[in-house]
């Protein structure tokens, strides 16, 4: 695929070690270049920023399973996802797919379809799509052969969840939303409850099984993360097993434990935009103010990373460079992607162009190729 060769002029560009500055930016051969090349495009009135790297997002579910039913052509759903990602300035996206006892669009069979669809379209899309597996730790019967399946699905990133309602199950009480969950999974409420009770009863077997699984995945070079750590002890347990990414820690104690040990801390950008967690967990704003955040992720809402970075800047909590790093260079570092996250010579030409007045996304490029362009800016490139 052909990348643009062009010099962008007249815009305010976020440059490393400089900050926002009126500067020319040349892209060619899919990278940011040191020397001018190609035709010059006047971008006066616009702001050019590094492309957004989204570490964790499951907002794609509505594209591939509208109205509770999977699309017949899953590939088309992934293409629709890419369009939304690009329209929100996202140039690298981790698509977080559940592998869960919840079944339906979060069940193992559906996960396999999603990963196959991502692999099928990966070579024909502009946005870099990275699959992530969110594995429910108490699915003990699914451990056998899981590393091999993950390798076959070309999944480089696995995160561990435990969403079992242990409190209710320990009290022999019916979990909330049981009937709705069961119907989505295609089970009777009685069968679904029995399955939950069985997994809860076998919880003592989970740590040993996870020891082996984490070791096997690490041997494959898989990046490992834990989801919703609630205590410092939980974070330490995961770290001891090579799980170095803490996604959405629920408490200050868990986040501080991660920072002290040098683990990566990922927070949800909707938490920033909302001004707090919708579940009553630790406030992302508070954690960011304390330096307990390496990256912000879209979580369930793709417009939120950009909005969160701009809100952090407007509030004065961070300058633009620091805020934007949480959605560009920060997440790139977590993923080990040293070729992106900053508009520097030799880096991938991943960038998002905003209208300087209202901060809306008007164009997105990944690897020097246009993934999104809308409105009057298109005329500037055409002419």
Regions picked out by a protein language model, each given a short descriptive name:
Residues 133-144, 229-232, 237, 245-247, ...:
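Active-site glycine- and acidic-residue-rich loops that bind
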Residues 100-229:
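Metal-coordinating catalytic core of metallo-dependent amide/deamination hydrolases
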Residues 43-114:
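Metal-associated gating/positioning segment near the N- to mid-region
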Residues 261-271, 275-356:
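His/Asp/Glu-enriched, well-ordered alpha-helical/loop segment
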Residues 51-55, 93-95, 129-133, 156-162, ...:
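Hydrophobic faces of well-ordered beta-strands that scaffold small-molecule active sites
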Residues 11, 29-30, 329, 333-334, ...:
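C-terminal cap of metal-dependent C-N hydrolases
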Residues 1-49:
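Histidine-rich, glycine-flanked metal-binding segment
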Residues 152-156, 238-245, 260-266, 290-294:
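Glycine-enriched alpha-helix->loop->beta-strand junction motifs that scaffold or abut catalytic
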